Amino acid sequence: MATELRADGRVLENWNPENEETWDSKIAWRTLWVSTFALTIGFCTWYLVSAIAPVLNDIGFDLTKGQLYWLTAIPGLACGLFRLVFMFLPPVIGTRKLVTMSSLLFLIPMFGWFFAVRDTSTPFWWLLVLAFLAGIGGGVFSGFMPSTGYFFPKRLSGTALGLQAGIGNLGMSLIQFVGPWVMGFGLLGLSFVAPQTNNSDGGTIYVHNAAAVFIPWAIIAAVLSWTLLKDVPVKANFRQQIDIFGNKNTWILTIAYLMAFGAFSGFSAQFGLLINNIYGRESAFAETFDPATLPAGASFAFLGPLIGAGVRALWGPLCDKFGGAIWTFIGGVGMTVCTAGAALFLNPSHPDQFWWFLGFMLGMFFFSGFANAGTFKQMPMILPPRQSGGVIGWTGAIAAFGPFIAGMLISSVGAPGFFWGCVVFFIIATTLVWIYYARPNAPFPG
């Protein structure tokens, strides 16, 4: 006879999602929505730098293209490192304290960038420090996702994790859309902060607004988390958690997720700069065409993460129905083809070729949503419950280095070398997914 669920305290007693008698769907879904709200603010924090970097030189900073690529790459490096820490926290401190603490940590880089952009003499090294701190926003992913996984049965894991990751990923698009928009006017309560001059058009611009606009929402997330969330008594020490590295599926799924989310996050962080440097006002076309007629990275940068995150959120139920492996495979094939197509337009002869480049890039983001949703459905199905949370955290940590890898390689080998290198890596990863998971009679279907 099942032990009765006790949910009156802060810690859920006898919680077992696989048994209807010891699972409460209301608690599970409430946990999902509150932590997803906090995760969305976290991803806004992570990609704050990519929204601000394209306009820094317009307000008086004197940064090279290489320095701007590094600024947008450092949050990815930091995120990966932070995820290696956060992946161990869910069974140690519990969901409630984890989400609350994380929401408060988002305030540090927000306030830091608010003050930094006000002073154009801010040294580059300090901008790098603030960029590193922004990585906290993405780092919490490897804590939130395993934590949410404790609350749902396997049959709903694809839907739950797909919704959380997909909606959370929308924060990347949200900040790149809202950030440039709120730079255009004074925010309520901040009208006393004088705007800066936009050297590109002579107008005024409120760059600090991009850092300030989500501060109230981070505080709300902390309050909601502390008052509404509960903890699941899943306990595991460090030694018990690192046994995931003896399972070969950990490494194959890491490669697959590095393709899926690593590329999604890496291209998202660099998308605006790539547009500006190849087709926009920083490109060679600016010498012969009116810069005002050339595409602006800030106008298109949000589209990629919006599409990829939206598809990821919507595809969770389909992964529950058909399995994740086939969608990871289809996503990998599509990403390979679209990235190769985009690579053909990295040395354009006319600005009109931009639309081909944009189309292929948005196609790559679209298929990344398939692959991201698929891999996160596979993990709980292939791995035992205690290991699946750790593998979700680990793969998320490694894939989070995507923005850093993208920025580092683009600045060192150039965009064409980076794009074609991605094509080769995608082929390898997709082949592994087919051999081990997606083909008929695969050894580990999921």
Where in the sequence are the language-model features?
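Extracytoplasmic gate region of multi-pass secondary transporters
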Residues: 49-54, 247-309
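C-terminal transmembrane helical hairpin of 12-TM major facilitator-type secondary transporters
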Residues: 323-375
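Glycine-rich segments within core transmembrane alpha-helices of 12-TM secondary carriers
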Residues: 158-184, 395-406
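Intracellular juxtamembrane helix-capping segments at the cytosolic ends
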Residues: 139-153, 369-383
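A late C-terminal transmembrane helix in Major Facilitator Superfamily
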Residues: 172, 382-415
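Central cavity-lining transmembrane alpha-helices of secondary-active solute carriers
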Residues: 70-88, 302-314
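Cytoplasmic membrane-interface "Motif A"-like loop-to-helix N-cap segments
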Residues: 92-103, 320-333
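C-terminal membrane-cytosol helix-exit motif in multi-pass small-molecule transporters
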Residues: 184, 215-234, 432-437
